[in-house]
Design a protein with these regions (language model features):
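Aromatic sugar-binding surface patches on proteins
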Residues: 146-167, 258-273
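Extended low-complexity, serine/threonine- and proline-enriched intrinsically disordered segments
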Residues: 103-141, 234-249, 286-291
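Short glycine/proline/serine/threonine-rich loop/turn segments at secondary-structure transition edges
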Residues: 151-153, 166-179, 272-284
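Conserved, compact domain cores that house catalytic/ligand-binding motifs in diverse enzymes
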Residues: 213-265
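Gram-negative bacterial Sec-dependent N-terminal signal peptides
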Residues: 1-23
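Proline/serine/threonine-rich low-complexity linkers at boundaries of modular beta-sandwich domains
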Residues: 57-79, 195-203
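Contiguous beta-strand segments within globular domains
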Residues: 74-124, 157-159, 214-223, 233
Length: 340
């Protein structure tokens, strides 16, 4: 089993478009700041990074659905907003789609332009599901009556649901984008249209729910058992949290796997846990397995509260920085700019 850790993106370019004199004056400060950031980043390996406990779980945050909003002609209100309950679904999953209509905020209105007429409800809301080949999968009717997945009658949030069928599923180990065109129409035939979407994902491997942990070379390693249906490249990512639920570290690992059952390691670098000053037991608060052989990647679900480790003491973990050579070299080059 070959393993290749994922490289994070490096910092953005140091320079913006500005007069040369301004760039020359700003270069030492920007270079020094970037060099310091690189030296801080170099303390940890590319495959295990610290996460501030004050921030949301990065895996869960990355799966939050985006709200798409579209106003009427010439910016007329109300604007139609649409979103889904998740960004990915697999065969047999029930997808929930939501829509609401609301007047534009003051910040989104052009005060110099004549105010267009605002349309009034009630509204009939429908959705058309279309795959990436333009084939219609279904027509959906949204409701706001507190039934069939709609949480509260009359709250202005319209809901539709759809069970992902096997007849339209992508090949195993792949995924395809599905668009949903949402249309709201009132009695005056005023119309609002907005586009949303999701990923119809059919991963080539699944997490089994079995995990085990160990201390290895001063770091915490959690192994996840996976069942692989098709050979390919897979990406495992997980977030480690304290017993109080504070996120501590994000670890990721990319591996090529053949069909069958395998254990895949997530290594959380010990210095992160040492510096956090928090002892175990720790919780694998979120974990997900992605099939990464083709675009778009076939995302797997994010499993929460997946595993609780043994009660390790934080002093059992290494206190040595990882000293990433690529980042230290970059920092040295930037510091050379400051000395000129």
């Amino acid at each position: 089993m070959k393993s290749k850790h994922i490289k994070p993106l490096l910092a953005a370019s140091l320079f913006s478009l500005a007069p040369m004199a301004t760039i020359a004056a700003a270069t030492p400060d920007l270079a020094a700041q970037a060099a310091a950031e690189y030296r801080t980043m170099a303390r940890y390996p590319e495959w295990s990074q610290p996460v501030s406990g004050a921030l949301a779980d990065p895996l869960l945050a990355g799966r939050e659905a985006t709200v798409q909003t579209q106003a009427g002609p010439a910016g007329a209100g109300p604007a139609l907003s649409v979103w889904a309950s998740d960004i990915r679904y697999s065969t047999g999953d029930t997808a929930y789609f939501y829509a609401s209509l609301a007047e534009r905020t003051a910040s989104s209105v052009n005060l110099l332009a004549p105010a267009p007429r605002s349309a009034a409800g009630p509204w009939a809301v429908t959705g058309e599901l279309v795959d990436n080949n333009g084939q219609q999968l279904a027509m959906l009717s949204y409701r706001d009556d507190g039934k069939d997945g709609d949480q509260q009658a009359g709250d202005g949030v319209y809901t539709a649901s759809y069970v992902l069928p096997a007849t339209h599923q992508p090949d195993i180990g792949s995924a395809k984008n599905i668009a949903i065109k949402v249309t709201a129409v009132n009695a005056d035939q005023d119309q609002r249209v907005a586009l949303g979407g999701f990923l119809y994902s059919q991963p080539g491997a699944q997490l089994t729910g079995e995990y085990r942990d160990r201390l290895s070379e001063g770091s915490l390693v959690i192994a996840a058992k996976v069942d692989v249906a098709v050979a390919g490249r897979y990406h495992l990512a997980g977030v480690l949290a304290s017993a109080l639920g504070e996120s501590l570290s994000l670890s990721q690992n990319a591996v090529h796997l053949e069909p069958g059952s395998h254990w895949v390691d997530l290594s959380f670098y010990g210095l992160i846990l040492r510096e956090a000053g928090v002892s175990g037991p720790y919780t694998l608060s979120s974990v997900t397995l992605t099939t990464a052989g083709a675009m778009p990647n076939a995302l797997g679900p994010v499993v929460t509260a997946a595993h609780v480790t043994k009660p390790y003491l934080n002093v059992q973990f290494t206190d040595k920085p990882f000293a990433r050579a690529d980042l230290l070299d970059a920092a040295t080059r930037l510091e050379g700019l400051v000395k000129r």
